Structures are given as structure tokens and as C-alpha cells.
Amino acid sequence: MQEMKIKLFTIQEVREFVNQVILVDFEVDLIQGRYTIDAKSIMGIFSLDLLSPITVVAHTDDASAFFKKISKFAA
């Protein structure tokens, strides 16, 4: 399990992020406070406070390629 902090400011960024998550073959969660949601859920992402950083949790031992693809969203 590996983690990274991100920020998503626009609807377009949320769509781009979800499109990257859909391509991986492992589970990815988003955590903010006490809420944990599936990173593939656009509606779930919009239920979070997008003004605050969000923790991305990749349930794999090697998420470096995935984190490189989403690095533009790094907080």
C-alpha cells in the first residue's frame, strides 16, 4: 500500500484523474478525514471537500508508474 497527497480543483481534473485510475489493475482509494471512497467514483470524489488535500491510497506494492501519471495533481 502506497500513499500520495493530491488536489483536484476542476471538474476536468476530476475526470482526468478518474480516467487514470480506471487504467490500473489494483484498488485505489481516496481518503479525506474519516471518509474513504473508491477513486473510480466521480460522484464519490465530488462528495469530498475539493479545497483540501486528498490522500490517494494505491493497494499495491509498486505504484510508482501510477503515481508518475497522476503527479500533475500532487498537492
Q: Locations of the language-model features?
A:
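Short glycine-/aliphatic-rich beta-strand segments at the starts of folded cytosolic domains
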Residues: M1-K7
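Conserved beta-strand core positions
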Residues: M4, F26-V28, I54
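Amphipathic alpha-helical interaction surfaces in cytosolic regulatory modules
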Residues: I11-E27, Y35-L50
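C-terminal structural segments of small proteins and small subunits
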Residues: S47-A75
